[in-house]
Amino acid sequence: MSFQEIRILFDNGLVKTPVGVLAETNGRVLFEYDSAWVSGGVELSPFHLPLAEQTYRFESGRLPDRLPGLCADSLPDGWGMLIMDRHFMRQGIARNDISPFQRLAWLGDEAMGALCYQPSLRSSEALLEAIQIGVTAREAIQLFEGRILAAGRLLARIGGSPGGARPKALIGCAPDGVNFVSGAGSLPEGYSHWLVKFSASRKSITSEYGRYEGTLEHICLAMAAAAGITVPESRLIDDGSGVWHIAVRRFDRPSPSARLHSATASGLLHADHRLPSLDYADLLKLAWSLTSDMRHVLEQYRRAVFNLFVGNRDDHAKNHGYLLDGNGGWGLSPVYDVTFAGGPGGEHYTAYLGEGRQPDISILLKLAEQASIKAADARLIIGQAQSAVATFSALAKEQGIPSGLRRQIEKQLTQIGSSVCGKR
């Protein structure tokens, strides 16, 4: 089924409001806001689709996902794309023939954030099904490692929307914290929306790093919180086989039925997240332009500093997020996808004033100066990040990270600290 036109709606959990229409013709993508949405005054994409009663035109080949960033943010990354591609392949549609509009229609009402798309290829019934984490994890890992060719019906529904490369699923957590249901749609009262990431490596679930991937991200979030960064609630779930998976509470779903609009730097700036397309100077400017609030600028600076000291080089444009509150105000979302991760050629996806491999403290201080952050505040933030990362060894021991893997990461963190601040 092909589509030349997709309707975009805003779903706050109570009512769906028309936002606009997306169309494609002769290699161009066209977008028009609904006039009532323009009158409402809520800016969803202020830099590339500012509110106006006009037709926006884009050359589809010049857009990172052949869609305006407002809609491209709804598309998943590696894992969700894998599930989506396998679905269309079973319908006889080759990967290269899947249109962006078909992908949006496949997401339908179940995209992350508050946007939904019509017509939808999804069933309108939002069935709640009990989930066994171990069973779902095994299926997800087998698909991820190529041992099965397609996701089952339930995994396709709860695993096809989230972004990121790792296998994951949307779940609803019961008040008792031990029972789970499918979490793509609304949940019963008392339940909460979570995203569970299944620990796995590309080689084997028995590889050491793969088995502890979720635990290591859980540790990174604890260190980020200690560095003064806003983090989502997270917990570790045992699947019964000795592998722990990290579950993160969804910040775009603050209650069983409510939804918040989310956006990334990639979508807001039309920056390709597959390439090293941004600098932290860009993100600091974005924080001020979008929020006019120095608190968010300082928070963005904290994240830049922490990503450097913790060795999170997978800091691409989709890993910097924003939320739109119920009053139409923007703010940074809680941090996500923060862990020990490599980048292109050993560099950060997001550079520090053009330096991606070995930024040092002088660059961090200059970055702060350009963002009108006082040197004393910058040094305090740098010190807090260093102190937080220094707790890794104790946290890793507490969480049962094997000594060999722990020492390997400790060595990497020490090398980064020496590179940034100089050997002592």
What does each of the following model-derived ranges do?
Residues 1-317, 321-424:
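Phosphate/dinucleotide-binding and metal-coordinating scaffold of catalytic cores
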